[in-house]
Amino acid sequence: MTIWVDADACPNVIKEILYRAAERMQMPLVLVANQSLRVPPSRFIRTLRVAAGFDVADNEIVRQCEAGDLVITADIPLAAEAIEKGAAALNPRGERYTPATIRERLTMRDFMDTLRASGIQTGGPDSLSQRDRQAFAAELEKWWLEVQRCRG
């Protein structure tokens, strides 16, 4: 099992949580980005640099992730594809995407894209709060406990 991170858009504070978790869990953590990243020295943490371009990092994560892996992303289509492959998906605010919720999220994303294309200003997400960081850490821990239970 591996934790895959859509690292270009992942907040640094979330990456820090993931670095500590990878060490504690002794779980491979792969940060996929189209730029060089600095990560702490660890046998569990590595970076995968991809070419710049639209969805290049996302496509690489989808190509390499497997059932049982965890994908960290705020990108709804990437989360949907990861779930289709049997991976779990979690956004940096601590929301776990599920097969039941991802369809709704895709519909809302498409609706917001339509609004923006018609010239309506929809605004962006709020900045990451302490509550978001705590929710992320809690949901990551919950996923890890599920993995441990399945392993036996």
Curated annotation (Swiss-Prot):
Coiled coil: none annotated. Pfam families: DUF188. It comes from the Bacteria. PANTHER family: UPF0178 PROTEIN YAII. HAMAP family: UPF0178. Belongs to the UPF0178 family. This is UPF0178 protein YaiI. It comes from Escherichia coli O7:K1 (strain IAI39 / ExPEC). The gene is yaiI.
